[in-house]
Amino acid sequence: MIRKRIASGTMMLCAAMMLVACSNQTESQNVSWKIDSNLQHIVNEPEILTSSNPGDYIAANTEAYAQILDTGEEGLNFLIQQLDSSSNDGLKEWLMAQASTELLGERNLVEHWQSGKDWLRQYKMKVE
């Protein structure tokens, strides 16, 4: 009888742990999907594709940009990881860096930067 209770309790504990792990993975996937889809929406805005000012893309897509910022600390970690792994240094990377600075708030140690990769390089130097 005691063995059955222990076995049953162990099975319930394992099931609960699996549900938590799956839930955390799903949340991470939601954050990455939310950021990726909103970045693509901003970058591909047809009305301002000719603008060379990255701020114009944010101004024309405030809702999509706000959704990126709504991802909080988990979004910040994803943005930095994506920026670090990107082989490009264009508009998308600039937007990722800008969102990162806003998510960091007062913790942002980089004042002047020219591109997304420039911001990341300076940020890494100051954090490490």
What positions do the PLM features span?
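C-terminal motif of bacterial Sec signal peptides marking the signal peptidase cleavage site
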Residues: 18-21
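Bacterial N-terminal signal peptides that target proteins for export
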Residues: 1-10
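Extended repeat-based scaffolds of very large eukaryotic assembly and lipid-transport proteins
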Residues: 25-128
